[in-house]
């Protein structure tokens, strides 16, 4: 559950939850329940959370906070944590850990590299500022802790313990010094990793999925941002904030819209109901992402991504196979995962039998090839936050100034640091700014990748299914603002996609085109409009005048922050 601020493009559609005043329930209900009433709600999430704040200049966290959480809420959280039974030697007192430096930040808080004094080892600690958090977010964090605590597999992130420190919730997890695979690719393999590395990573990922699915769990947000790499080459799947249970032998058991658009399966968008097959689809998209360095549709706004999912062909690596970038076996693996009909997709166990995995290597191959020459994730994070990095011309630079380095003497040195001089790295392309690639064509928008930082959906403009997104220079870092509804424009070709397999219907109309258009408009009214719709006429200030108890909000996760040691969620549920 580590946070790994990543940003290329992709955006989260995350579940709306009923607002709660206290977290004093014994068994947290799954966020998919009561979907009909949830469809009437719009989630009022704060855009970016703590991720908007620059890393502090203090050597340690503040000992006091201006606003104190109520005793009732504190006791409620303590009761929740006490119900999470762990078999762990990790201490549950803050004075037994030394925070070294931040390695990521997200909606719920910052993630620090820390040193466990009694055990003499490095860990990752997520620090959640409870006084700044809506109770729903705290509920989500505790839900994720429960899921992680139930995981017992080498390819799933390990949770150790959690406790309250003043008004902060500390979550202790594995420290994986390589950081997220998405971050590694941005720094070292921006155009994709070699097939043998991809196959090695994917095999470990499938083993983790096989375990999850055998325990009736769906991850629902599988992508390279949530794949963490250890200094020893260990590969672990993280970020269980939007995972869900499914009923065994049930074909369609979930209907919540949740995930990151570029990785979402068609059945999620069409609300037909789904099961673990959505993870297999996301796995196939991730397989493409590893070869190309980016997922299909990465440069499209969500509305166009959804259009392609509904009416376009499944993505394929045919071009890469023709060019010799990947083998026929690798392409075949992707094709099997990206069947539009969920029942035609193999399960994780069946996929592990695919011949392509015969070329998978051991973890030491990951160390010698994927991690070789890379500085540890905290160094890359610091570089991306440094003034030199932010001053480097970059189409998506939007990071605050550099924080001071958190130091402590008793630090377990990373093997990645040996004989490596930190180079002057350009800011990661995963920076979180929405930029129009072509000012003359504002409809062409480069979307950042999801990193579990929610923004208000009313700030998104959907005009005829293809309205642009924009970032206001007048707003705090990471905030989107609603731009004026543009006049209806048509490009000369009438294209609504790009050259990478997206649909581009001509301006001329036909019964088939009109049928699709009518269907999508109907679908958008009932689904997509809830995620991206603008406020009703005469209600332009609606989003700014909701009462505290107003339940109307969707949760749509966008990848605003640069995930370095991830887990935070970019997801959508409605």
Swiss-Prot record:
Keyword Kinase attached: yes
Phylogenetic lineage: Eukaryota, Amoebozoa, Evosea, Eumycetozoa, Dictyostelia
Record field: compositional bias (Basic and acidic residues): 24-41, 536-553
InterPro entries linked to this entry: Kinase-like_dom_sf (IPR011009), Prot_kinase_dom (IPR000719), STRAD_A/B-like (IPR047173)
Annotated Pfam families: Pkinase
Protein's GO biological process: protein export from nucleus
Compositionally skewed regions (Low complexity) per UniProt: 386-403, 418-441, 462-475, 492-506
Residues binding ATP: 103-111, 126
Residues the record lists as Phosphothreonine modifications: 256
UniProt-recorded name of the protein: Serine/threonine-protein kinase fray1
GO CC annotation terms, alphabetical: serine/threonine protein kinase complex
Region (Disordered): 24-64, 381-447, 462-514, 532-554
EC number: 2.7.11.1
Reaction catalyzed: L-seryl-[protein] + ATP = O-phospho-L-seryl-[protein] + ADP + H(+); L-threonyl-[protein] + ATP = O-phospho-L-threonyl-[protein] + ADP + H(+)
Organism, scientific name: Dictyostelium discoideum
Active site feature: 221 (proton acceptor)
UniProt domain Protein kinase: residue ranges: 97-357
PTM section of the record: Undergoes autophosphorylation in the catalytic domain.
Kinase in keyword set: yes
